[in-house]
């Protein structure tokens, strides 16, 4: 009986040690939940062009920059990540995926188009192309921005609805018979000061206006510029193939509002022109 008692005691001791060690191992080893990758749904508001039945679409190779800030703070967790569009698969891909923090914190998202490498933080300057006569110069000047400050960690996707933040100017031009328009330029400031968190876009006040070459689009010429009030004087410069130059002058300041199209009708055959 004594021998049996000792064996039972030893067996019990080893069993206790095994259970104790197993429990300690489980307690010490941590298994963090993986960070949840974020899926974005991008769309563009029709606000500016709805009256003409037009709509802006993202096209193959377009790039947007995205920032992720911890909600309630100014801490930037994702800084100007590059997302680009693949038309063949109708998908957006990124240089590195955006995830919610492991601690479950919510994020505010801010985005802009077109993407500019080297930007850090949600406050920066953006300048339109001085030559917008070709599609690339025009489209890469059309600044858009978006925000989402209501997303939750368990959302299946995050919607970012982009809005046109610049003014669009169009000019319908009539030149004397026999003349052919070579180029049309508008005198305006090129640079805007951006605050994505506030969705604020303002023209750089101390910048001098320059002539920006407009893009021919059907019977009109067009350009996108930061919203601004034009100064008095020579607003448009029209150059024709014969070498002659026509000027369209204003006698008062003209407002060019953001997210709107302002159309000018210019008749170069008018004797007073």
Predicted features along the sequence, with ranges:
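Sec-type signal peptide cleavage vicinity
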Residues: 2-8, 18-273
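Sec-dependent N-terminal signal peptides of Gram-positive bacterial secreted proteins and lipoproteins
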Residues: 13-17
């Amino acid at each position: 009986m004594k021998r049996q008692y000792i064996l039972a005691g030893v067996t019990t001791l080893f069993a206790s040690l095994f259970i104790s060690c197993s429990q300690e191992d489980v307690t010490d080893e941590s298994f963090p939940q993986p960070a949840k990758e974020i899926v974005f749904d991008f769309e563009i508001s029709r606000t500016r062009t709805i009256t003409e039945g037009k709509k802006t679409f993202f096209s193959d190779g377009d790039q947007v920059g995205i920032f992720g800030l911890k909600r309630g703070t100014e801490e930037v967790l994702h800084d100007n990540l590059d997302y680009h569009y693949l038309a063949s698969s109708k998908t957006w891909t990124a240089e590195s995926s955006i995830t919610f923090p492991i601690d479950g914190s919510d994020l505010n998202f801010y985005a802009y188009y077109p993407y500019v490498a080297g930007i850090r933080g949600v406050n920066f300057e953006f300048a339109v192309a001085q030559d917008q006569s070709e599609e690339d110069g025009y489209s890469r000047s059309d600044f858009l921005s978006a925000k989402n400050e209501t997303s939750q960690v368990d959302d299946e996707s995050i919607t970012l609805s982009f809005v046109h933040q610049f003014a669009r100017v169009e000019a319908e031009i009539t030149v004397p018979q026999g003349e052919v328009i070579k180029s049309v330029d508008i005198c305006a400031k090129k640079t805007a000061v951006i605050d994505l968190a506030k969705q604020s876009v303002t023209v750089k006040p101390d910048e001098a206006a320059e002539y920006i070459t407009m893009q021919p689009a059907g019977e009109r010429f067009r350009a996108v510029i930061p919203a601004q009030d034009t100064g008095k004087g020579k607003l448009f410069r029209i150059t024709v193939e014969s070498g002659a130059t026509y000027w369209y002058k204003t006698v008062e300041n003209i407002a060019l509002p953001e997210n709107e199209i302002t159309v000018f009708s210019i008749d170069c055959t008018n004797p007073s022109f």
